[in-house]
Amino acid sequence: MARKKTIFYETIEYIGPRPQLQKRRNRLGGWVIVSIAAVIGFWFGRPLVPSLRATQQSASVGQVGQVVSALEKSALPGAQLASAALEYSKRDVAYDASYYKIGFPMGDVAADKGMAADVIVRCFRETGIDLQELVHNDMKAHFNRYPQLWNAARPDTHIDHRRVANLQRFFERNGEALKPSRHAMDYAPGDIVVWSLASAEKHIGIVVPGPEGSSHQPWVVHHLDDEVRWENVLFDFRIEGHYRYHGKKID
């Protein structure tokens, strides 16, 4: 039923300022802006968190000798590789992922240049194992079983062993592949770990003991950005692969 009009609202005349409706505050808009800012800050700041944490948890070069001495007395299969990685962490190496033509076997880029995969290759060479030669031989015999990510038609001795995806496949095929976990007790010195970074890029490093006071913790030696580091970041990224490899010695 339609509401009946009253004479009251028709006959009384209001004299004064015209009433103004009070504007309702748009609280939703403010929350949307805050939420967007938070998402942007999280997304772009997330890659920085491990680096900031690593700055607080990295070890000094002076502590390397103590841990290396302990590893030399160890009977662990990966002790020699872990020692080589710790010694490598003292080197001044600029990050450079460029393609270079190098010799074969035992070829290498300039000693003051390198990237993540070079840490693995150079440290294994200190134990008498040349991954450049081993990866090439395996790719030559089983090329289609390796990642087809670079539009290559054949193996390339200049770069194949310097690609993390190829090293990962080599260790899967020729080493011991362990189930990735977030339990420190599952990792031993000399283990190889492959991570997936926030950018989805693959990264690789070598597990080593921590410095005095943290020797019970699995730390890593790796080359992520501007320098080679020995630091406590094993679980800062998503672990994609965990391997042990103690291959044949080079003749």
Language model features by range: what are they?
Residues 215-251:
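Low-complexity, Gly/Ser/Thr/Pro-rich intrinsically disordered linker/tail segments
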Residues 1-12:
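N-terminal targeting leaders characterized by basic, low-complexity, disordered sequences
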Residues 29-47:
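Hydrophobic membrane-insertion alpha-helices, especially the h-region
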Residues 140-221:
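...with weaker cross-activation on analogous glycine-rich loops/strands in unrelated enzymes
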Residues 113, 195, 225-226:
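Acidic helix/loop microenvironments that form the catalytic cleft of cell-wall polysaccharide enzymes
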Residues 10-16, 23-26, 45-170:
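N-terminal capping segments
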Residues 132, 207, 238-241:
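A structural signal for short, hydrophobic beta-strand segments that form beta-sheets
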Residues 1, 24, 30-31:
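Post-transit mature regions of eukaryotic precursor proteins
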